[in-house]
Amino acid sequence: GILNGIDPDYYNPKTDAEVFENYTWRSVARKAHNKTALQRSLALPEREDVPMIALISRLTAHKGLDLVSCVIDEILDDDIQFVLLGSGDAEYEAFFRDLERRRGDKVRSIIKYDKSLSKKIYASADLLLMPSRSEPCGLSQMIASAYGCIPVVRETGGLFDSIKPYNRYTGEGNGFTFSAYNAHDMMYTVRMAIDYCRDTEFKNKFASTIMRIDFSWKSSGEKYARMYEQI
């Protein structure tokens, strides 16, 4: 399918006035400065080396939050940080508030919609989790890519069309994916992504690569134009 697109001028870490520190695909190591600034602002332990997972989403069932709630405690037994931003169903708002209360040394649950803060999180986090049950298009994985935040997604709809799994043998792919709607498949993929992200050289190279993908409306528009020419 032909994907939606994002505005590459608005979602651009080189010029974005709302991130802590600007950077490009050539200076992607500066993402680490954004991470420590975000950690400071959220009162999380300030560590460049700790893998940070972001979940920026409407808190509704079709976004895969039942999978997350099932295994997030096991994932948090690893040395990671988890930052959630979003609002929605009362049961999920309560769950993630309680998760921060229980695991406050490594979790921040910000229960609201905040576009400016979302950009700070994309610029800071190493991984974006999108375990959606259904996702007709999805823009968050494209925004994350623009900021060098590596998508971890379920293979459905627009996520399947836009994110291809990393292949360690060929070096191809622009994220980490799982296909079954299953909490333990998700956890396995998240853990694999975390392990890769502990290698700073790999992580920065991968982030630099995905930052150069053209997810703009211009790219989508050209595909539409070609399609109509063939009719």
Predicted regions and their residues:
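Catalytic cores of carbohydrate-active enzymes across secretory and cytosolic contexts
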Residues: 1-231
